[in-house]
């Protein structure tokens, strides 16, 4: 018996397109393509498993662009007799994220007595085409209380996604507001809701710290004389120039963005 999503996947359940995005040519809008992926399947053979899942199967991506995982429909079927005990937890995972709570995009729990089930998730975030090609999503399956011999398959899952493929994120910049401008310094843009510890540190300071750390220990001197003097092309003496942390800090302070 093949697994199917009972109802057609409706784009309107996940995406609200404007009139311009619906009717104007793709080159005139920020939305390049709205697509529904082909079905990808995960066969759960073990009680605990973490498997790669291709949520963009059959989706044509844009080179150097982005893809937004707008929505996801998951359907499952227990390959068991009726009225079996036990259940399962299914969790979608972004394997790029190192913190466990940030890597989990959504979860669903159901009992084995419910032979067929389906649920929707709305991740609604974008990744680059380069990341998407590396198949960054996984599914964590945790089966409990099902008494079946090892090597057999108690559960099958299928995944279909609704995604937006686009070339540029420039439209998102229209939501930004200027929150602070210091005389002689760079203009910094930020969203309205930002963690305080992030907002309190100017980007220039972070850049300076990063560059200093990456260049630490790379001090060099120009010239071969031992009296802190060097010769230019005309044979005149000049002071040696030290290239290191001090000169880089000065450059960072005078840069404008």
UniProtKB/Swiss-Prot annotation:
Disulfide bridge partners, by residue number: none
Compositionally skewed regions (Basic and acidic residues) per UniProt: 224-242
GO molecular function: RNA binding
One GO CC annotation: host cell cytoplasm
Compartments in which it is found: Host cytoplasm, Host cytoskeleton; Host cell junction, Host plasmodesma
Record bears the keyword RNA-binding: yes
A GO BP annotation: transport of virus in host, cell to cell
Pfam families attached to this UniProt entry: MP
Keywords, sorted A to Z: Host cell junction, Host cytoplasm, Host cytoskeleton, RNA-binding, Transport, Viral movement protein
Positions with biased composition (Low complexity): 247-257
Keyword RNA-binding assigned: yes
Segments of this protein annotated with the region Disordered: 212-257
Function noted in UniProt: Transports viral genome to neighboring plant cells directly through plasmosdesmata, without any budding. The movement protein allows efficient cell to cell propagation, by bypassing the host cell wall barrier. Forms a ribonucleoprotein complex with viral RNA. Binds microtubules and modulates microtubule stability. Can bind double-stranded DNA.
Protein name according to UniProt: Movement protein
Organism expressing this protein natively: Pepper mild mottle virus (strain Spain)
Taxonomic lineage: Viruses, Riboviria, Orthornavirae, Kitrinoviricota, Alsuviricetes
